[in-house]
């Protein structure tokens, strides 16, 4: 599904990604952990095409297509989804209109007919149940006046509606209490299929206990320096990153 080869990227004159190699197959969940400033959020931003970042070297293929040649909106239409660490508010734009426009833009890109109102409302009802989203939230402006937990739940609802092939959750657990985290994790788990994959970027293993990735990668100074299974997240939670720095020859 996703193949990243020797990816280098910078913002301004500062190089942040310094040779990322990563392969994600259909149906896999990968977690990316690492100290602050290691490049985790930069990687997600580069994958979705944030224009603030410049790719200076490397290749990225998404389902066999050159991702780096695509516009950000085309990456989304191809099935890439990013859940932001800090979701933005869009006053005056209702969730219903926002989601209907997003879905029909994707359908247009794929050569499909627009979804009519009845089909859309039925889909909205089905997906709202999955993430336990209050119908009142679905009728308000996008994220306006939402609590932190409501914003995150709303993003998982958007993910459910858009049915992406690869979802990137960038510190979705940031600021969530355990109950809200469980609802987010349950939603993500229910949406996983053998054809869809997920990247979970996090500092903590609590979310990973609920989502359970098959692979855990440690990003440090712009490179993936260690890969393991769920047990790696446990070791990091208990012992921090110093032992990994020692392992790769850094103090």
Predicted features along the sequence, with ranges:
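Conserved structural motif at the start of ABC-family nucleotide-binding domains
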Residues: 2-4, 17-19
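Short coil-to-beta microelement around the adenine-binding A-loop and adjacent beta1/P-loop entry
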Residues: 14-15, 74, 182
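The feature captures the beta-strand-to-loop junction immediately N-terminal to the Walker
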Residues: 33-38
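ABC ATPase C-loop
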Residues: 159-160
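Conserved beta-strand-loop-alpha-helix hinge in the C-terminal portion
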Residues: 215, 219, 223-246
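Walker B catalytic motif
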Residues: 168-172, 179
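Q-loop/switch helix immediately C-terminal to the Walker
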Residues: 82-86, 92-108, 120-123
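ABC ATPase NBD Q-loop/coupling interface
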Residues: 59-75, 143
């Amino acid at each position: 599904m996703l193949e990243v080869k020797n990816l280098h990227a910078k913002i301004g004159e500062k190089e942040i990604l310094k040779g990322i190699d990563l392969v994600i197959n259909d149906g896999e969940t990968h977690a990316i952990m690492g100290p602050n400033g290691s490049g985790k959020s930069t990687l997600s931003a580069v994958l979705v095409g944030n224009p603030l970042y410049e790719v200076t070297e490397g290749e990225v293929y998404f389902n066999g297509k050159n991702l780096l040649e695509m516009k950000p909106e085309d990456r989304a239409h191809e099935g890439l989804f990013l859940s932001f660490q800090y979701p933005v508010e869009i006053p005056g734009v209702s969730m219903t209109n926002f989601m209907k426009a997003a879905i029909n833009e994707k359908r247009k890109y794929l050569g499909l007919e627009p979804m009519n109102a009845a089909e859309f409302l039925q889909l909205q009802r089905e997906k709202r149940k999955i993430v336990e989203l209050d119908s009142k939230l679905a009728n308000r402006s996008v994220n306006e006046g939402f609590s932190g937990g409501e914003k995150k739940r709303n993003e998982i609802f958007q993910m459910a509606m858009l049915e992406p092939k690869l979802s990137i959750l960038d510190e979705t657990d940031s600021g969530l209490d355990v109950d809200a985290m469980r609802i987010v994790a349950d939603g993500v788990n229910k949406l996983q299929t053998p054809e869809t994959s997920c990247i979970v970027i996090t500092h903590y293993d609590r979310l990973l206990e609920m989502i359970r990735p098959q692979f855990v990668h440690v990003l440090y100074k712009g490179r993936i320096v260690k890969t393991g299974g769920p047990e790696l997240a446990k070791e990091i939670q208990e012992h921090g990153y110093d032992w990994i720095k020692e392992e790769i020859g850094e103090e």
